[in-house]
């Protein structure tokens, strides 16, 4: 049975999105991405070349694949910077699906500036971009981003690169309940079990970069993430049993042999 992830006009069979940072070279980036089964790889346009054909270009490593490049605005601290960047990206590459992130704290937490993100979202939506908006795990802001035109919201699990996993499970559920667009848990994933937890909570997908790129064996971790996302999604759809404080016998008490 198909289980398609729809983000705006785009459809994906994989619910795992990977990043492109912190790899030693583009070939390793390619190998890990293909091992993950992901159909999108996000790229910090201000740090990784996808626009200059005269320099080594990450897009060249994925031309023979079905992996879609997802430009992001990492490094931007204002709405204006992000808007300008994405206009340049679309002009140079034709890519119109984007990961919008505007960072408020560049020193320690890399938390998003949600008000600047919201301003950028309003403008870019009017220009027909397909917007995936990185935000905090706040259902109110998630709904505002949806109303502003975001096609997916991406609440953080924990600070970017921290590897802490999902720190507030209830907020993931609250965000999921608040919006009618896909919820992609982004940032803070440390290992495969973190991805599975996010999916079990009802997230529509997971984005991870550091957990794969900085693993001792990135290819093996990419494969682990692939299976974790699938397992978490299957468990969510299957429906977990309720948690109870006391035991419940798994075998019936009726018909016991009397001694």
Swiss-Prot record:
It is found in: Cytoplasm. GO terms for molecular function: thiazole synthase activity. GO terms for cellular component: cytoplasm. The keyword Transferase applies. It catalyses: [ThiS sulfur-carrier protein]-C-terminal-Gly-aminoethanethioate + 2-iminoacetate + 1-deoxy-D-xylulose 5-phosphate = [ThiS sulfur-carrier protein]-C-terminal Gly-Gly + 2-[(2R,5Z)-2-carboxy-4-methylthiazol-5(2H)-ylidene]ethyl phosphate + 2 H2O + H(+). Its main location: cytoplasm. Belongs to the ThiG family. This is Thiazole synthase. It comes from Nautilia profundicola (strain ATCC BAA-1463 / DSM 18972 / AmH).
């Amino acid at each position: 049975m198909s289980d398609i992830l729809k983000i705006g006009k785009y459809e994906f069979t994989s619910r795992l999105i990977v990043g492109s940072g912190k790899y030693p070279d583009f070939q390793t980036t390619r190998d890990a991405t293909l091992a993950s089964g992901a159909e999108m790889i996000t790229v910090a346009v201000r740090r990784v070349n996808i626009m200059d054909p005269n320099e080594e270009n990450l897009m060249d490593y994925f031309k023979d694949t079905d992996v879609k490049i997802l430009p992001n605005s990492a490094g931007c601290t204002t709405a204006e910077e992000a808007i300008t960047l994405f206009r340049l990206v679309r002009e140079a590459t034709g890519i119109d699906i984007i990961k919008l992130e505007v960072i408020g704290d560049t020193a320690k937490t890399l938390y998003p500036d949600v008000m600047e993100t919201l301003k950028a979202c309003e403008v870019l939506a009017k220009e027909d971009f397909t917007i995936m908006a990185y935000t905090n795990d706040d259902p109110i802001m998630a709904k505002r981003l949806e109303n502003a035109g975001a096609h997916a919201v991406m609440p953080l699990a924990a600070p970017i690169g921290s590897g802490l996993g999902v720190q507030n499970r209830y907020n993931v559920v609250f965000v999921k309940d608040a919006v009618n667009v896909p919820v992609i848990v982004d940032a803070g994933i440390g290992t495969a079990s973190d991805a599975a937890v996010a999916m079990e909570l009802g997230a529509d997908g997971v984005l991870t970069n550091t957990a794969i790129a900085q693993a001792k064996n990135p290819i093996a971790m990419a494969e682990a993430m692939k299976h974790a996302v699938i397992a978490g999604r299957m468990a969510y759809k299957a429906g977990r049993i309720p948690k109870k404080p006391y035991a419940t016998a798994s075998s019936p008490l009726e018909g016991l042999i009397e001694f």
